[in-house]
Regions:
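Structural marker of alpha-solenoid helical repeat scaffolds
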Residues: 72, 106, 139-143
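Residue-level recognition of tetratricopeptide repeat
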Residues: 76, 110, 144-145
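Canonical tetratricopeptide repeat
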Residues: 82, 116, 150-154
């Protein structure tokens, strides 16, 4: 009898612990990884087309689509982040800076914008600002994230006189 009660209590305890861990893990998964302004926002077709164009390095066409997407949602940090990225890749750092600032004003912990802005700072020769962005990413990504890794790698390359691949 003692063992049956003990076993039932053990199973109940184990089930509760397992479920609570599952809830914690799923909440991290739901909020982790991406840099989306709001996970539930529906992106426009222009946004998705722009992302495809960016992946093909067609930055001018991507900018056209992102500007159209912006008209439907002026509070989407992802749109501004990709505008900053596209302008940076085209060499227009002034425009890139404006869009990274907009993205970070909307979402100060936007990992993608912090990483890409850090890359821009390195291009401008501003190591201190890039390191400040890396420090912010380390706080946001306490378990590590790809954006932190990428910026850290770029800073190491910068310190060796090498160019970043991002």
């Amino acid at each position: 009898m003692f063992y049956q009660n003990f076993f039932k209590k053990f199973i109940k305890f184990f089930t509760i612990i397992s479920l609570s861990q599952l809830l914690v893990v799923s909440s991290f998964a739901a909020g982790g990884g991406g840099d989306e302004s709001k996970k539930m926002d529906v992106k426009s077709n222009y946004y998705y087309k722009a992302v495809k164009l960016i992946n093909k390095k067609s930055y001018e066409a991507a900018i056209d689509n992102l500007l159209k997407a912006e008209k439907t949602n002026k509070k989407d940090a992802d749109i501004y982040n990709y505008l900053g990225f596209s302008y940076r890749k085209m060499g227009n750092l002034d425009k890139a800076a404006q869009y990274y600032d907009k993205a970070l004003k909307i979402s100060p912990k936007h990992k993608g914008a912090l990483e890409y802005q850090g890359e821009m700072f390195l291009t401008q020769g501003n190591l201190k600002k890039a390191e400040a962005n890396l420090k912010k990413l380390k706080k946001i990504c306490f378990l590590g994230c790809k954006e932190e890794k990428m910026l850290k790698e770029s800073i190491m390359k910068y310190n060796k006189g090498q160019k970043s691949s991002y």
